[in-house]
Amino acid sequence: MRVWVDADACPNMIKEVLFRAAQRRKVQVTLVANQPLKVIPSPFIKAIQVSAGFDVADNYIVEQVEAGDLIITADIPLAAEAIEKGGLVISPRGELLTAENIRPRLNMRDFLEQMRSSGEHTGGPAALTANDKQAFANALDRLITKGLKDS
């Protein structure tokens, strides 16, 4: 199992959880972004900087993902593509995104996109809380444990 992180918008507190998990569980974590990333020195953690551009990092992740890999993202279209390839997806809030629950999220995203394009202000997601961080850490641990057991 490899862990892929859509790192452009990944909060630092979530990256810290990922770094600790990579070290403790000896799992390969790869952060992908179109800007330089700071990562701790570790044989289990690497950062890949892709060229700037719309969805370049997302497309790179989708190309690399294999069935059973874990993807960390809040990007719903990226999550949908990763799920189609057999990836497991959790959001930075610890929500497990699946084939069963991704379609309604895609529909809501598209609806909000239409609202924004018509000039409606829809706001953004709430700031991450300590509870979100804990939910993420718990979900990450569960999925890594399952992934290591299955491999």
Swiss-Prot record:
Superkingdom, according to UniProt?
Bacteria
What InterPro entries does UniProt report for this protein, alphabetically? UPF0178 (IPR003791)
Identify one Pfam family in the record: DUF188
Family assignment from sequence similarity: Belongs to the UPF0178 family.
Q: Can you name this protein?
A: UPF0178 protein Sde_3033
The protein's organism comes out as Saccharophagus degradans (strain 2-40 / ATCC 43961 / DSM 17024)
